[in-house]
């Protein structure tokens, strides 16, 4: 394990704020807010800035050891919808893809999928990525279910990050968790393997 002044690598995983009461089976893949560190990993929480301060300290400690920090990000779905989503409460149903009956599309297999094809959602994701890179000095991003993001959106994400750091690393899972409208016509970027084992 890589050890820092704020803990080990294993303690650092799942650092984005996620909504989950039962943490017995959760790796932080139910994001509630994309832009805040998960406060449950904070040591001796005394004020609201402890989560951000300790995360920055941890990343700095990794960098001092020559270790790049790749953040596992989940921009393909959120922990909830409606009153369970800060995004739905801000702009009802705008942040999510809807099916032809007006229901939440579920290409993530988690109850919803984020509409990165909507201009303001795409801009918000780019701003979020830039926030993590500029304010926390993240070196790269691994996208969960990247197959739910349009190729053009991923290109724009990369270009925005490349402007900050030409050495940025961006990669992700080239599949979705279910059937999605975004996958139509993108067979070259998706895997049709029922149980991907990391080989393509």
Residue ranges and their predicted role:
Residues 1-136, 153-165, 169:
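Substrate-binding/active-site clefts of carbohydrate-active enzymes
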Residues 29, 139, 145-200:
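Active-site-proximal helices and loops of the catalytic beta/alpha 8
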